[in-house]
């Protein structure tokens, strides 16, 4: 089954903030983060069901090289709705707010 992946603006902001942080640590690392996170997002069209729920119905697709980070998402019908690209150790309260905003 192939899903349509929806990426709202806050997810773009998450992705850019993490890439900028990585680029400050080592030039070029931010671009590597962007490439890998975009690859994971693109793969969700076909692999969304492979990732187990982490919180309620929120799933987490972990990045390989940047394994502390993941793409958080929910499945609604034929859509994968991205919630965030964040560090996996963050307290989940922020995630619940974004999930509630989906309705």
PLM feature spans:
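Arg/Lys-rich, positively charged N-terminal/basic patches that mediate binding to nucleic acids
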Residues: 1-34
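Residues at the C-termini of beta-strands that transition into short coil/loop
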Residues: 9, 64, 86
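Short arginine-rich
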Residues: 21-25, 44-49
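Short, hydrophobic secondary-structure boundary micro-motifs
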Residues: 31-32, 52-54, 93-94
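Basic/aromatic recognition patch in beta-strand/loop cores that engages polyanionic ligands
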Residues: 39, 46-81
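Enriched for short, Lys/Arg-rich terminal
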Residues: 68-70, 74-103
């Amino acid at each position: 089954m192939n899903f349509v992946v929806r990426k709202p603006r806050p997810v773009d902001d998450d992705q850019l903030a993490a890439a900028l942080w990585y680029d400050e640590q080592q030039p070029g690392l931010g671009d590597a983060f962007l490439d890998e996170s975009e690859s994971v997002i693109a793969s969700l069209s076909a692999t969304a069901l492979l990732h187990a729920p982490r919180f309620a119905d929120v799933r987490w697709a972990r990045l390989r090289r940047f394994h502390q980070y993941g793409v958080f998402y929910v499945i609604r019908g034929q859509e994968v709705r991205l919630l965030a690209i964040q560090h996996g150790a963050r307290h989940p309260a922020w995630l619940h707010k974004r999930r509630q905003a989906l309705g």
